[in-house]
C-alpha cells in the first residue's frame, strides 16, 4: 500500500494547477489526492463530517499555520493513519510559470523529511 500525497489547492489558481501537474510525476511512488480547499471548507463541504468543533479547529489551524502557503501538501500513511506536513515552499521557483516551478528533487527530499504527527508544522 502506497502512502498518499494530499494536495490542498485553490480553484483557478495557476500555481496550484502547476504544482498538481508536477506532483503527478510522483504517482508511481504515491497515491495522489487533490482537494479544492474552498469546497472542502464550505458549510456543506467534506469538512462538515468532522463536526463543528473539529471543523473549526481545522479551519483555525489552516488560517494560523498555512495562510502563507499558496498550496499545501500533506503525506498520509494509510497503514498507521498518520499525517505529516510537507514544506513545499522550499521546492518552488516562482520565476517559472509552468510545472517546472516545482523542483521535484527538493520536493522528494521534503516529502521524505516530513515527520508524522508534528503539529504545528515546523518551518524554516
Curated annotation (Swiss-Prot):
The keyword Transport applies. SUPFAM superfamilies: Thioredoxin-like. Disulfide bonds join 13-16. GO terms for cellular component: host cell cytoplasm. Pfam families: Glrx-like. InterPro entries: Glutaredoxin-like (IPR008554), Thioredoxin-like_sf (IPR036249). Homodimer. This is Glutaredoxin-2. It comes from the Viruses. Keywords: Disulfide bond, Electron transport, Host cytoplasm, Redox-active center, Transport. It is found in: Host cytoplasm. Glutaredoxin necessary for virion morphogenesis and virus replication. Functions as a thiol-disulfide transfer protein between membrane-associated OPG128 and substrates OPG095 or OPG053. The complete pathway for formation of disulfide bonds in intracellular virion membrane proteins sequentially involves oxidation of OPG072, OPG128 and OPG088. Exhibit thioltransferase and dehydroascorbate reductase activities in vitro. Belongs to the glutaredoxin family. Induction: Expressed in the intermediate phase of the viral replicative cycle.
Amino acid at each position: 500500500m502506497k502512502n498518499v500525497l494530499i494536495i490542498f489547492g485553490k480553484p483557478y489558481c495557476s500555481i496550484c494547477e502547476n504544482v498538481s501537474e508536477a506532483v503527478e510525476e510522483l504517482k508511481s511512488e504515491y497515491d495522489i489526492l487533490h482537494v479544492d480547499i474552498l469546497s472542502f471548507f464550505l458549510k456543506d463541504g467534506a469538512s462538515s463530517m468532522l463536526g463543528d468543533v473539529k471543523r473549526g479547529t481545522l479551519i483555525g489551524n489552516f488560517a494560523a499555520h498555512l495562510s502563507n502557503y499558496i498550496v499545501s501538501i500533506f503525506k498520509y500513511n494509510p497503514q498507521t493513519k498518520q499525517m505529516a506536513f510537507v514544506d513545499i515552499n522550499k521546492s518552488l521557483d516562482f520565476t517559472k510559470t509552468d510545472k517546472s516551478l516545482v523542483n521535484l528533487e527538493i520536493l522528494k527530499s521534503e516529502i521524505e523529511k516530513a515527520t508524522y504527527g508534528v503539529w504545528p508544522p515546523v518551518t524554516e
